[in-house]
Amino acid sequence: MNWKFSVAVCLTLGWQSVFGLEIIEVTVDVEDGRYRVFGQSRIEATPEFVYAVLMDYDNFHKLAGGIAESKFLPNDESGNMMAYTRFESCVLFFCKTLEKVERVVGQPTNSIQVEAIPDLSDFAFNESSWKIERSAGKTLLTFEAEFDPDFWVPPLIGTWAIRNKLLNSAESIGMRIEWMQAKGLTLAQVSE
């Protein structure tokens, strides 16, 4: 069955938090079981600070709800950085714990590329990227991901849930980063 469901949130007036966070766009598309997500926001923090926070896998679980555990693993045989993430999430009556082992490649202050290892993850395919750009004295943060879950996702509820989770995560991550930058804290110094 081939179906596509797309949700776009483009807030033309520019939704803003009390911190200055602006959520620009959030979209979720699914076709033939493969999800594509896109999120973009503008954050009142330097690109260097945003990059450092996003690369702190040992403390990444402190950024947003649903991430139960995150940590760096030993590098793989080629010397690539490896990380582990465990997510716990419920949508209505459907609850799932997901694990992901991934290769992490960072280009300091510019971008982070992440690729899950299917044999060690609950995803048949999962690639994501963070693009970090200076923009009008703030940081433009763009998140893109494409994934094939290795488990059943309720069709209409799943897309809605992923979109809501992405929007809530963008807000939570952005506000936490802005707060830490304003207070001069690293992610390691923040309590859970």
Name each region found by the language model.
Residues 50-51, 60, 104, 141-143:
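Hydrophobic pocket/interface hotspot
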Residues 31, 71-120, 171-183, 187-192:
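Glycine-rich portal/gate segments that line the openings of hydrophobic small-molecule binding cavities
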